[in-house]
Swiss-Prot record:
Entry protein name: Actin-3, muscle-specific
Positions annotated as propeptide: 1-2
Positions carrying N-acetylaspartate: D3
GO molecular function: ATP binding; hydrolase activity
Catalytic activity: ATP + H2O = ADP + phosphate + H(+)
Signal sequence, renumbered to the chain: none
Subcellular location: Cytoplasm, Cytoskeleton
First-level EC class: hydrolase
Pfam families, per the entry: Actin
EC number(s) from the headed UniProt entry: 3.6.4.-
PTM remark: Oxidation of Met-45 to form methionine sulfoxide promotes actin filament depolymerization. Methionine sulfoxide is produced stereospecifically, but it is not known whether the (S)-S-oxide or the (R)-S-oxide is produced.
Amino acid sequence: MCDDEVAALVVDNGSGMCKAGFAGDDAPRAVFPSIVGRPRHQGVMVGMGQKDSYVGDEAQSKRGILTLKYPIEHGIITNWDDMEKIWHHTFYNELRVAPEEHPVLLTEAPLNPKANREKMTQIMFETFNTPAMYVAIQAVLSLYASGRTTGIVLDSGDGVSHTVPIYEGYALPHAILRLDLAGRDLTDYLMKILTERGYSFTTTAEREIVRDIKEKLCYVALDFEQEMATAAASTSLEKSYELPDGQVITIGNERFRCPESLFQPSFLGMESSGIHETVYNSIMKCDVDIRKDLYANIVMSGGTTMYPGIADRMQKEITALAPSTIKIKIIAPPERKYSVWIGGSILASLSTFQQMWISKQEYDESGPGIVHRKCF
């Protein structure tokens, strides 16, 4: 869409990162942490122009003097005042657009409480005066981005993981499973196991350093026991990482022990099934006739599925669980970190979608409840 005047805005608010941009683009223009920071101490320097809150990258860069809060927990918005700040920052500072001039497509977690959807709708129309808006389920958008309408999506981000079976474009709510195990838990676990090695990471600012170590060095082992043996026998798996203060730390079996907890949540002291079993359980909750189609279209999406080796391991684990004759295919597109946003960009630019928007007029006539009738 070349005329930016009417391009829809696509905003994917994740627990960890907010992705925003224009419908029709192939990648989000703005990607920033879903963080609101408030100063820990009163400013000493008068006239420094200190703000009472910072959002996104600015909050991140000033993290030493701020208390950081994430308004989205486990995929669901829990702090609306901070969320409004994030949306304001998205429109005015990141995309530099007037929200009253563009339709806005927002995303939501599967099984998002009804009241939450209504509140999102209300804020868009009443605070930002958008002409039209729509709320789409994240996993469904990821499936669209992979060019499918049927499949099961394993969407794992920073705050929550979901397995969502989708048939002919519709999510099957009775078979959606939620796993409160995602990137943030893995970062915390890596902090813990690095502490055992003698490196101490405790503050919110240091957690961000550990997150970076995780993203750069961690991977999923195909065979955990064998990998542990290799790590014990030689130093071939060790990598070094330079901290911001110049200190260099070495990390060995932590590289694969950390993401292994996706498959063995008992590492984190959790009793839930791993991601492979969750996918399997989700498929088993579906009608027997569509399972074959789901096994052949297992789509990975979200930042926590970015570990090298995760798709091969998933293939191996699901193959062990499923009937032996069945064809299993794991789809892990390289751009899966942003596939929810990309799916939103595709959806909002379809000509057939244009009648799906909730207009300001419809909202004024029916109130926030309209979102349940038009977005499903």
